[in-house]
Design a protein with these regions (language model features):
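Non-catalytic interaction/Regulatory regions outside core domains
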Residues: 1-129
């Protein structure tokens, strides 16, 4: 179930982006569209997850990544990967004020997942702009 909050975008459009993304890849465990201020716009986060906390953490991670790429003259941030023992987070900008955060399985084929997440981020950006 996807939740849309604080957005003027009708929920079915954003829900479809997240639904389609997870349908394309069994390696994507969850997905969320999060505004740069940390507000969760749409997500497949389980009910036991603290959406506010996840949003705040994701916004901080993206801000740090953007700052690091700028300071190190790497250009505009395109994606961030945070690796964990049991899975990875892949974060991509989905417009100037939104990011697509995905949790992916540890043994996922990253080439395919990155392409799918990139397409979904572009579609979300198109819908949000």
């Amino acid at each position: 179930m996807f939740i849309v909050s604080g957005s003027t975008m009708p929920s079915p459009f954003l829900n479809n982006v997240l639904d389609d993304l997870q349908a394309k890849s069994a390696d994507i465990v969850l997905a969320a569209l999060i505004a740069s201020d940390g507000m969760v716009v749409a997500s497949s986060l389980p009910d036991h997850q603290n959406r506010e906390r996840i949003g705040t953490i994701a916004a901080a991670i993206l801000a740090l990544g953007a700052r690091a790429t700028h300071e190190l003259d790497c250009g505009k941030l395109q994606q961030m990967m945070v690796g964990g023992k049991h899975g990875n987070l892949l974060i991509m900008p989905a417009g100037p004020e939104t990011m697509l955060v995905t949790a992916i399985r540890i043994n996922a084929n990253l080439d395919f997942v990155i392409k799918d997440v990139s397409r979904a981020a572009q579609e979300a950006e198109r819908l949000l702009c």
